[in-house]
Amino acid sequence: MKNFYLLVFIVLQSILFNSCSSSNAVVSHGSDLSKYKYVVFGKESTGDRELDDMIMLIENEIAKRFQVVSTQKCLELLSFGELILAPSINVKSEKGEGGHTYITIKFHDYGTSQSIAVIKSSGIGLTVSHDQKIALNAIRKKLDKILK
């Protein structure tokens, strides 16, 4: 029985140490993300086409925080002096033993093309889907933090 508890302890410990995330955000000096109300999505996404579902999940997270507009509507909003964010999303997932999932979102001002913020996260778990969930949760937390 003692060996059983030792085995359970070792398995739980290995799971805890094998699942981790990291994230980082850098906001351009003088930029105030609270001034932005709108976001436009386009063809700015890169990465493995097999990860389009992850890109859609990230777009959904961004859309929860801004009003999504079309590129045609952007021109009208810009003429009224509105600020619009345009994100570039990159997702990469290493397959195999000890793989990682990396997410990078670069926000730029649609009107000026100036870089506003870069958010990065990574996740490592027991499976590829676990890696992705960990990285997505890290991105959610970082978005919440910088888009208050």
What is each PLM-predicted segment?
Residues 64, 69, 74-126, 130:
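Surface-exposed short loop/turn segments
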Residues 16-66, 148:
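A structural "domain/chain start" motif
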Residues 14, 108, 146:
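Mid-sequence acidic-hydrophobic segments that form the walls
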Residues 21-33, 59, 114-148:
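C-terminal/domain-edge helix-coil "capping" segments
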Residues 53, 57, 100-102, 134:
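Generic recognition of short, well-ordered alpha-helical segments
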Residues 1-20:
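Sec-dependent bacterial lipoprotein signal peptides
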Residues 10, 29-30, 74-76:
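Short, flexible, glycine/charge-rich loop motifs used to bind or transfer phosphoryl groups or to couple energy/partner
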